[in-house]
Amino acid sequence: MAFLTGPRLLDWASSPPHLQFNKFVLTGYRPASSGSGCLRSLFYLHNELGNIYTHGLALLGFLVLVPMTMPWSQLGKDGWLGGTHCVACLVPPAASVLYHLFMCHQGGSPVYTRLLALDMCGVCLVNTLGALPIIHCTLACRPWLRPAALMGYTALSGVAGWRALTAPSTSARLRAFGWQAGARLLVFGARGVGLGSGAPGSLPCYLRMDALALLGGLVNVARLPERWGPGRFDYWGNSHQIMHLLSVGSILQLHAGVVPDLLWAAHHACPPD
């Protein structure tokens, strides 16, 4: 993975101000690089390498796993939901890889700001498109309510996405997505008490999905474990890498719930009113 001799790496104090967002990661910062220099950093050790590969390898796996395990031929008119689900699973790790790979670009803060916005758009997409099949299946037998719920959640997601894009800090970005999480919990609650429908085993997957995502966000905001040992987790095992792994698990739980849900919706006959 890391087999080239890279440039002289910087410490936290010497890195550009826009990259000084974690004061507990003390070393391993790449110097300002050209586009080709950023690509070359795939092959030498630095403090973003783990972030790049955790989501890069996950993206390669999702590119195979998600489309191949989606039962396209059985979805019928709900095939568009399979498409939105694939986008929801693939865009976040792709945006994350681009963000972490090119964040040291010599274009400086303006380029970094655009990359951060791209990364936030990926998070917003998984929160938005990822929930549409869940809402669709939960309200499968309430056709009068389903369109309003889908449009309402989409509008809420637009507000959450804007707040995340304009948030001044990591904790503010996490709070921006809280409204979407709250709306999903209402949907899960409706399903849990019998007011909603869906495949029997999907709800636990969705609960694990949001639990993993929340845990990852909290670990990232708390800067753990590097807060307990500044400099000890500069390259491996820091909070952002842990968040990446938890987010991969969250997407896998989403996929594990959506596939049986869509199959259930395709074959289930709602009782007459």
Swiss-Prot record:
One of its GO terms (molecular function) is molecular adaptor activity. It is a multi-pass membrane protein. Expressed in adipose tissue. Induction: Upon high fat diet, expression is induced in adipose tissue but not in heart. The keyword Transmembrane applies. Disruption phenotype: Knockouts adipocyte-specific show a normal phenotype. Upon high fat diet, body weight gain is comparable to widtype after 18 weeks. Liver weight is reduced with diminished steatosis and brown adipose tissue mass is reduced. Animals show an improved glucose and insulin tolerance. The chain crosses the membrane at residues 52-72, 79-99, 115-135, 185-205, 245-265. GO terms for biological process: protein stabilization; regulation of ceramide biosynthetic process. InterPro entries: AdipoR/HlyIII-related. Its main location: Golgi. It is found in: Golgi apparatus membrane. Keywords: Golgi apparatus, Membrane, Transmembrane, Transmembrane helix. GO terms for cellular component: Golgi membrane. Plays a role in maintaining adipose tissue function through the regulation of ceramide levels. Mediates the stability of ceramide synthetases, CERS2 and CERS5, and their activities. Belongs to the ADIPOR family. Interacts with CERS2 and CERS5; the interaction regulates CERS2 and CERS5 stabilities and activities and is inhibited in presence of ceramides. This is Progestin and adipoQ receptor family member 4. The gene is Paqr4.
